[in-house]
Amino acid sequence: MEPIITIRSLSKIYGEKVALNNISLDIYPGQIIGYIGPNGAGKSTTVKILCGIIQDYDGDVTVAGINLKENVLEVKKKIGYIPELSEMYDLLTPREYLTFIGKLFHLEDSVIANRSSKMLESFGLLPNIDQRMDSFSKGMRQKVLIISGLLHNPQIVILDEPLSGLDANAVIMVKELLQVLKAEGKTIFYCSHMMDVVERVSDRIVLIANGEIVANGTIEELRKDSSDSLEKIFSQLTSSDDGTERAGSFASAYRDNNTNGEHE
């Protein structure tokens, strides 16, 4: 099977900061890839390059046989991008916003209306279809963002902390939705800090630190002969300790008897 996404020698530098350092990766159709790493590791930069948001980089990226640098607009048609609470036109209603998004992908009005209604209903938002989104909670806006990223039935779905602000029922639904999309042959690139979710839903886990891939495999392969959780593996590969020492040091800041403002 040919990979649907091929990344070769990908590098990106911001001034003197190396965000990505010569990473290479193959992603195959029907896979859920968990892409994890500490803050500043290069996760968001990778996502923005794949989505065509950042176009100034070194290396080669091919998506569905299309060179990203040569035809970024064609690649964007194949990708559904679901970020963590990006800027929205929140003076619009969900109906207006999703119609706008659908038009960007040249969908017919009837298709937009049908898909929007069904997806909003699944999230319990159909009664709010004509309500301005500036009155929505964080979770409600995130649900609309998820719908907007899937409205055009993309071949590849890229999610960057998609569960932010969602209620428990919506989280369960999204996790089930990922499995449905996978069964349909879609490729899921899931970027998150939520280790327990990544561990449960991913076929492969790619761990990035300091702009470099430090682990790439199934959870079983990453565990090797241990039974450590993904959280423990993450800590072992990206930190000098398991967090216990740092947590104790943090807590000692307010236990210091000489600290000004201490409450008796």
Which residue stretches match the model-derived regions?
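Conserved ABC ATPase "signature" region
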Residues: 99, 103, 110-128
